[in-house]
Amino acid sequence: MLIIETLPLLRQQIRRLRMEGKRVALVPTMGNLHDGHMKLVDEAKARADVVVVSIFVNPMQFDRPEDLARYPRTLQEDCEKLNKRKVDLVFAPSVKEIYPNGTETHTYVDVPGLSTMLEGASRPGHFRGVSTIVSKLFNLVQPDIACFGEKDFQQLALIRKMVADMGFDIEIVGVPIMRAKDGLALSSRNGYLTAEQRKIAPGLYKVLSSIADKLQAGERDLDEIIAIAGQELNEKGFRADDIQIRDADTLLEVSENSKRAVILVAAWLGDARLIDNKMVELA
């Protein structure tokens, strides 16, 4: 496995792969890798000749400096996991390598609408940071496919739109959420939970599933469903942050024409902001 930290060396390797006619898959990450990331890697390996994993804690997508400062940096352990998975290339640049003149004056990519609604409304600038770094990685790696987790549902929708709008010739693959046996969605942020909070955490998925059951049973008073779900989360020990039921294809409000809904839940548990989602077919 090759570990590359600079743009010139990355370009050199990508040129070589292109000359050899290899099909390249990219898995963009911020490191602190868990089994959910490994599922992305496995999907990439199944679809391409060469797998490139990027590890970069992107300062542009953090709306709170304290979150950026405490985000775990575990490069050595991450590389050991990726080596066992037989990943071909790891791109692990420094912030200086990606943003040589800082982030304030760096050119950015913004996806109107999707970047400022829902999760974007509570985290100003977050999705602009995501679309900027992902577009830069697409330009650098020139992948045929790129794999993203469906846990970050809005992020996946945003990237799909950016790819369509910008004309990137890249297949975007959404990989289903990987869960612990108790239902908790795997996330790097789970590492912020205490042992006691970890016991409470699966309650998020239980509330999510309860909302899904109500929708599948034909209930359509969304305001009431959301209000009850918020109460349930708070009673379980969470601080409900945002609960949305949206059209899964547009992320707009559910209408009589909506065929699928997505339930998006965000809640605080101690210092960890946990997110999860679930799709529901609407009869």
Swiss-Prot record:
The active site is at H37 (proton donor). Its EC number is 6.3.2.1. Pathway: Cofactor biosynthesis; (R)-pantothenate biosynthesis; (R)-pantothenate from (R)-pantoate and beta-alanine: step 1/1. It is found in: Cytoplasm. Coiled coil: none annotated. Its main location: cytoplasm. GO terms for cellular component: cytosol. Keywords: ATP-binding, Cytoplasm, Ligase, Nucleotide-binding, Pantothenate biosynthesis. Homodimer. HAMAP family: PanC (MF_00158). Catalyzes the condensation of pantoate with beta-alanine in an ATP-dependent reaction via a pantoyl-adenylate intermediate. The reaction proceeds by a bi uni uni bi ping pong mechanism. NCBIfam families: cyt_tran_rel, panC. This is Pantothenate synthetase.
